[in-house]
UniProtKB/Swiss-Prot annotation:
NCBIfam families in alphabetical order: gatC
SUPFAM superfamilies (UniProt xref): Glu-tRNAGln amidotransferase C subunit (SSF141000)
HAMAP family noted in UniProt: GatC
InterPro entries membership: Asp/Glu-ADT_sf_sub_c (IPR036113), GatC (IPR003837)
Reaction catalysed by this enzyme: L-glutamyl-tRNA(Gln) + L-glutamine + ATP + H2O = L-glutaminyl-tRNA(Gln) + L-glutamate + ADP + phosphate + H(+); L-aspartyl-tRNA(Asn) + L-glutamine + ATP + H2O = L-asparaginyl-tRNA(Asn) + L-glutamate + ADP + phosphate + 2 H(+)
Gene that this polypeptide is encoded by: gatC
Biological process (GO), any one: translation
Function: Allows the formation of correctly charged Asn-tRNA(Asn) or Gln-tRNA(Gln) through the transamidation of misacylated Asp-tRNA(Asn) or Glu-tRNA(Gln) in organisms which lack either or both of asparaginyl-tRNA or glutaminyl-tRNA synthetases. The reaction takes place in the presence of glutamine and ATP through an activated phospho-Asp-tRNA(Asn) or phospho-Glu-tRNA(Gln).
Subunit description: Heterotrimer of A, B and C subunits.
Recorded GO MF terms: asparaginyl-tRNA synthase (glutamine-hydrolyzing) activity; ATP binding; glutaminyl-tRNA synthase (glutamine-hydrolyzing) activity
EC number: 6.3.5.-
UniProt protein name: Aspartyl/glutamyl-tRNA(Asn/Gln) amidotransferase subunit C
Disulfide bonds: none
Similarity-based family: Belongs to the GatC family.
Amino acid sequence: MKITREQVEHVARLARLELSEAELDTFTGQMDSILSYVEKLNALDTEGIVPTSHAVPMENAFRADEATGSIGVEAALANAPLRAQSFFRVPKVIE
């Protein structure tokens, strides 16, 4: 499957990218190379090959989740420049 310059322009528009003429030429060639490689991979006989979801065995390296005590509301808000009841008050950032 050969990718066309028009297809690269279409993908760039979808991604909201503005590409120069040189970039369009470069990316057309690069995407064509990638698709050629994928076609080679698709042609391989993978019958009887077990799918691999992870190359190495997965282990949970994190500790067990245990509840512990924490500081109180007043201590947490002690240095807050603005507060509203028992919450931090921050400037409005979205209109």
